[in-house]
């Protein structure tokens, strides 16, 4: 009699799944962590809610109202979740039939779109971006049959550039009545003029992902948002967990989204942008750096000579970057989070010391 292992009992797609390699999963023993696009220093908050004996609200009123005011939308157009990553998954669960429907995304881009779909058993289709990392609209059009959700990250992680707004409009017209278009705006605070939040009235099939992990300096809080029209939000509410936000998370999120919290966030953004420009200018003068790409975010993508050796050399010095070599069209590329001036200087000095 054959023995059935625990792994044999698992779903086939889970057995075959490669989990998302988050910055923390990849590890490292560094003291300069520039691989997860986090804010470099901790922001302090005081807990004010002490009712931990009670279950929290599913959609905490103060958080929803504060975020709606900040984003310029109605409270009914906001869903809060455990990071934007949960929003990615909720959209697939609400709109895609496993074994029948597909999602579509455009690499090189964020890795969780495919992981979420594969976990649920939904087909992934890819249409690589053009050489300038803009959308291949003809390629997308050719593959749309059977696609229910299209993910577009703007500004894009890891390349750092915005997607052309006219291309977004064309995509929204192509998908009208066919699929949900998801604009992942995790980094939009660094270029707020480019947000599509004002387009929701025009496009009922548009959804927008947001997070407190980047500019709000709260990656450890795990708090994200989906902005969409009420019909979409109501469907997502059917598949979200009953208590997605703990009471302490909701408490801190509401404080971060207060008028004072928004002012503090914008000050952090200005500081990071100034530091980004300093680091870009320095990188362009370093011999082992072949190319530095423009960025609208809190990170910089650069192409290096012998990038694997450079990555390991800095890793061994406790400077942890993100290797993007395996992404389509990103051979030789490393992604560097913009940190403090001291961290920037550590990177600059280490790279200058590299033998080319």
Swiss-Prot record:
Its EC number is 2.6.1.9. It is an enzyme of class 2 (transferase). The keyword Amino-acid biosynthesis applies. Its cofactor is pyridoxal 5'-phosphate. Signal peptide: none annotated. This is Histidinol-phosphate aminotransferase. InterPro entries: Aminotrans_II_pyridoxalP_BS, Aminotransferase_I/II_large, HisP_aminotrans, PyrdxlP-dep_Trfase, PyrdxlP-dep_Trfase_major, PyrdxlP-dep_Trfase_small. Pathway: Amino-acid biosynthesis; L-histidine biosynthesis; L-histidine from 5-phospho-alpha-D-ribose 1-diphosphate: step 7/9. The keyword Cell inner membrane does not apply. Gene3D superfamilies: Aspartate Aminotransferase, domain 1, Type I PLP-dependent aspartate aminotransferase-like (Major domain). GO terms for molecular function: histidinol-phosphate transaminase activity; pyridoxal phosphate binding. It comes from the Bacteria. One of its GO terms (biological process) is L-histidine biosynthetic process. Keywords: Amino-acid biosynthesis, Aminotransferase, Histidine biosynthesis, Pyridoxal phosphate, Transferase. Disulfide bonds: none annotated. The modification N6-(pyridoxal phosphate)lysine is found at residue 214. NCBIfam families: hisC.
């Amino acid at each position: 009699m054959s023995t059935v292992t625990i792994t044999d009992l698992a779903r086939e797609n889970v057995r075959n799944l490669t989990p998302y390699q988050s910055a923390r999963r990849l590890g490292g023993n560094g003291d300069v962590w520039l691989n997860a696009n986090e804010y470099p220093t901790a922001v302090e908050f005081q807990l004010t809610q002490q009712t931990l004996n009670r279950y929290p609200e599913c959609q905490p009123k103060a958080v929803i109202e504060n975020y709606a005011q900040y984003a310029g939308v109605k409270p009914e157009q906001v869903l809060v979740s455990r990071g934007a990553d949960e929003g990615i998954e909720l959209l697939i669960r609400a709109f895609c039939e496993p074994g029948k429907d597909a999602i579509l995304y455009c690499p090189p881009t964020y890795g969780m779109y495919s992981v979420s779909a594969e976990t649920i058993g939904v087909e992934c289709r890819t249409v690589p971006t053009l050489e300038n990392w803009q959308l291949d609209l003809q390629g997308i059009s050719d593959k749309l049959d059977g696609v229910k959700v299209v993910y577009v990250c703007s500004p894009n992680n890891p390349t750092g550039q915005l997607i052309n707004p006219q291309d977004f409009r064309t995509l929204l017209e192509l998908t009208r009545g066919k699929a949900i278009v998801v604009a992942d705006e995790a980094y939009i605070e660094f270029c707020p003029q480019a947000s599509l939040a004002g387009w929701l009235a025009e496009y009922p099939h548009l959804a927008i992902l947001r997070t407190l992990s980047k500019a709000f300096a709260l990656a450890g809080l795990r708090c994200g948002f989906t902005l969409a029209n009420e019909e979409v939000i109501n469907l997502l509410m059917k598949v979200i967990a009953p208590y997605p936000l703990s009471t302490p998370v909701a408490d801190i999120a509401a404080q971060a989204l207060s008028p004072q919290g928004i002012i503090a966030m914008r000050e952090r953004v200005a500081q990071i942008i100034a530091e980004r420009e300093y680091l870009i200018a320095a990188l362009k003068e370093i011999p082992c750096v072949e190319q530095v790409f423009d960025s609208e975010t809190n990170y910089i993508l650069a192409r290096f000579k012998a990038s694997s050796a450079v990555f390991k050399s800095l890793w061994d010095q406790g400077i942890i970057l993100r290797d993007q070599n395996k992404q389509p069209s990103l051979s030789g590329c490393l992604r560097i989070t913009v940190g403090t001036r001291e961290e920037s200087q550590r990177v600059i000095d280490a790279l200058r010391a590299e033998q080319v």
